């Protein structure tokens, strides 16, 4: 059987040797050149390939059409990936009739993503393993050919566990590869509900937070000890690295980070204490804990912790245009919870952000972006991060007021983009899931999916193309003039304060608010085209946490990125959303304040939205970028979001009803 191999690291060497032992006809080996900045403790795939007299390549982009064509010419029957660090394109995977298989260092679907060996230790797991699975478009998500379990001991480090995983990979491949030569193996689909994802780790992730338990900190130490950069803390400005430690079940009344003793060197944690067995100080020598204390002048009752800043760092100034809107007010709440941020906001109303008006870190001006251009330009110049959240984003307006949509969503926002270029300010721009249009991919990918819209006479696409054109303009400014930007694409965020019932009364609201209005007023719930359209609903708190991490932008990780923010597991049709709402409504404690349910009513989209409307059957995000870049995973189930959103609007409706007679008397 002819095979193409993509491999790196020790596991890559194991995989290559296992294929050779099993008698595979290896046509070519693709690997990576060594990174001089990486502590390379593992064997070389290139050397193993050379010893086996195999052709070996290390292209910068193996998915380039030239390399795809060269692989096509080799006519592989099967493709293997063993710790190769780049995703292989669908085009490459389609070249092998038997498909492509990847060896992953965990028991999938748990610990998808990067650095699974380090992560299982950080999280204190007692078992892991290796998985051979078929490669699909979504990373680490394909059906499983086989697994081999590995026990994790209390004293395992990343290096010792790596050795166990290497042996496990060898055993798994010795079992599976000969059978795969005889014919396709039965594959077991992964359970998405059990999946977890962990992103890339950096040296900075080794910083110790002493308020955590001694057990948790010790897990970090063994996860990142040699050959990795190590867990570290600071004594004033001086850094110390911990190579080996031991958690102690010790009761104390000291603040976390306080040195309890120097021989042995023991530090108070949020729960228990940590004995530092070996480490290094600024001299760089590997020494015992008590010697480390002597070298660094550590004494009892001194505190270890974060490196103090030499200068008083001012707060990051965030300008939010449309601060009173759904995303704007929730984002403001999250930013003001962190004393690193100061928020400047503009909007035509203030009902949703009135709760922040007394906060000294919040500055608000009531105004219209089309009128207050001088105020906006001044504050773009003054602030650090700019979020232009002002837009018409309700579907009925796309056909009812297409020119107004274009003028506000494109023309006014283009001015803001150009001011960001002019003053060299970072822009975090709200793109939209609408830009994907009628994309035919199973999951909409920021980097590869086609953006497909309808004909010109379908005016509903004016919002989509206005946003898409701004995305392209921002990208071009980034490439040509160095604009710092991040584009984020929300997928059906919902929660309290999404639109309001007055907007729903004139049809200018999102789906859930419109459905709630029907329940509140006792009118039939109108299901456009039967409500068969599916969407992935995302809780506002999940969405805001991702957006907060984009604004935070650790190590510039979000610069020049496009990031979908959605929850693929919360997919439901509009009819299913309506039924879920109805169930929660009937069980709500305020149910008696509202009329009887008037039933469902199917209605054609043209009758509801008018001529020029065209709908999309489904809209499912790929969130690999959010997981990889932000280390973010949506957590809140749709039922919880629906319940909280309904509760917010029902309580608001009751207050509105009880206030009405007073208003009439005052009149």
UniProtKB/Swiss-Prot annotation:
Pathway: Nucleotide-sugar biosynthesis; UDP-4-deoxy-4-formamido-beta-L-arabinose biosynthesis; UDP-4-deoxy-4-formamido-beta-L-arabinose from UDP-alpha-D-glucuronate: step 1/3; Nucleotide-sugar biosynthesis; UDP-4-deoxy-4-formamido-beta-L-arabinose biosynthesis; UDP-4-deoxy-4-formamido-beta-L-arabinose from UDP-alpha-D-glucuronate: step 3/3; Bacterial outer membrane biogenesis; lipopolysaccharide biosynthesis. The record marks 140 as: Raises pKa of active site His. Residues 314-667 are annotated as: Dehydrogenase ArnADH. One of its GO terms (cellular component) is membrane. The record marks 102 as: Transition state stabilizer. InterPro entries: Arna-like_SDR_e, Bifun_polymyxin_resist_ArnA, Epimerase_deHydtase, Formyl_trans_C, Formyl_transf_N, Formyl_transf_N_sf, Formyl_transferase-like_C_sf, Lipid_A_modif_metabolic_enz. Homohexamer, formed by a dimer of trimers. This is Bifunctional polymyxin resistance protein ArnA. It comes from Yersinia pseudotuberculosis serotype O:3 (strain YPIII).
């Amino acid at each position: 059987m002819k095979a193409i191999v993509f491999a790196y690291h020790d596991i890559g060497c194991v995989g290559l040797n296992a294929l050779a032992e099993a008698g595979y006809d290896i046509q070519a080996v693709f690997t990576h050149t060594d990174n001089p900045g990486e502590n390379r403790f593992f064997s070389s795939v290139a050397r193993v390939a050379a010893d086996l007299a195999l052709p070996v390549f290390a292209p910068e982009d193996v998915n380039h059409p030239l390399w795809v064509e060269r692989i096509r010419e080799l006519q592989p029957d099967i493709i293997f990936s063993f710790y190769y660090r780049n995703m292989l394109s669908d085009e490459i995977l389609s070249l092998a009739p038997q498909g492509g298989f990847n060896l992953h260092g965990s028991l999938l679907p748990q610990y998808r993503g990067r650095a699974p060996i380090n992560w299982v230790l950080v999280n204190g797991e007692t078992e892991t393993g290796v998985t051979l699975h078929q490669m699909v478009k979504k990373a680490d998500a394909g059906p499983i050919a086989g697994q081999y379990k590995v026990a994790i001991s209390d004293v395992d480090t990343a290096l010792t566990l790596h050795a166990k995983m290497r042996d496990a990979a060898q055993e798994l491949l010795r079992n599976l590869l000969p059978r795969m030569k005889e014919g396709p193996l039965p594959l077991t689909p992964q359970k998405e509900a059990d999946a977890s994802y962990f992103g890339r780790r950096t040296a900075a992730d080794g910083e110790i937070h002493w308020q955590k338990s001694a057990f948790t900190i010790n897990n970090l130490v063994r996860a990142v000890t040699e050959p990795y950069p190590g867990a570290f803390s600071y004594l004033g400005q001086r850094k110390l690295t911990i190579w080996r430690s031991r958690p102690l079940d010790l009761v104390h009344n000291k603040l976390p980070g306080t040195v309890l003793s120097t021989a042995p060197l023991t530090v108070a944690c949020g729960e228990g204490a940590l004995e530092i067995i070996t480490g290094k100080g600024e001299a760089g020598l590997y020494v015992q804990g008590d010697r480390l204390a002597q070298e660094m002048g550590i004494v009892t009752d001194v505190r270890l912790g974060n490196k103090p800043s030499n200068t008083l760092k001012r707060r990051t100034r965030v300008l939010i245009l449309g601060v009173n809107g759904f995303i704007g007010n929730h984002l403001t709440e999250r930013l003001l919870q962190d004393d690193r941020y100061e928020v400047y906001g503009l909007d035509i109303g203030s009902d949703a952000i009135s709760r922040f008006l007394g906060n000294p870190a919040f500055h608000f001006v009531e105004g219209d972006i089309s009128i207050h251009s001088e105020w906006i330009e001044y504050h773009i110049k003054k602030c650090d991060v700019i979020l232009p959240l002002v837009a018409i984003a309700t579907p009925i307006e796309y056909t009812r007021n297409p020119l107004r949509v274009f003028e506000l969503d494109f023309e006014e926002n283009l001015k803001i983009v150009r001011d960001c270029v002019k003053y060299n300010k970072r822009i975090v721009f709200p793109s939209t899931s609408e830009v994907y249009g009628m994309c035919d991919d199973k999951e909409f990918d920021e980097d590869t999916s086609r953006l497909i819209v309808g004909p010109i006479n379908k005016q509903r696409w004016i919002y989509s193309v206005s946003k898409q054109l701004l995305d392209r303009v921002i990208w071009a400014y980034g490439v040509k003039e160095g604009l710092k930007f991040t584009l984020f694409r929300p997928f059906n965020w919902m929660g309290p304060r999404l639109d309001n019932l007055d907007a729903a009364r004139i049809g200018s609201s999102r789906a859930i608010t419109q459905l709630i209005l029907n329940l509140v007023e006792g009118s039939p719930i109108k299901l456009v085209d039967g409500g068969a359209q599916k969407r992935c609903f995302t809780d506002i708190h999940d969405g805001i946490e991702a957006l907060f991490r984009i604004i935070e932008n650790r190590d510039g990780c979000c610069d020049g990125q496009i990031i979908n923010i959605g929850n693929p597991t919360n997919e439901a049709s509009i009819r299913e959303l309506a039924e879920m709402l109805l169930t929660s409504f009937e069980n709500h404690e305020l149910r008696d304040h509202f009329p009887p349910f008037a039933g469902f009513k199917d209605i054609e989209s043209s009758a509801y939205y008018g001529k020029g409307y065209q709908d999309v059957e489904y809209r499912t995000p790929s969130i690999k970028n959010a997981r990889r870049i932000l280390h973010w995973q949506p957590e809140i189930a749709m039922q919880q979001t629906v319940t909280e959103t309904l509760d917010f609007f029902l309580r608001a409706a009751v207050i509105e009803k009880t206030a009405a007679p007073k208003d009439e008397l005052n009149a």
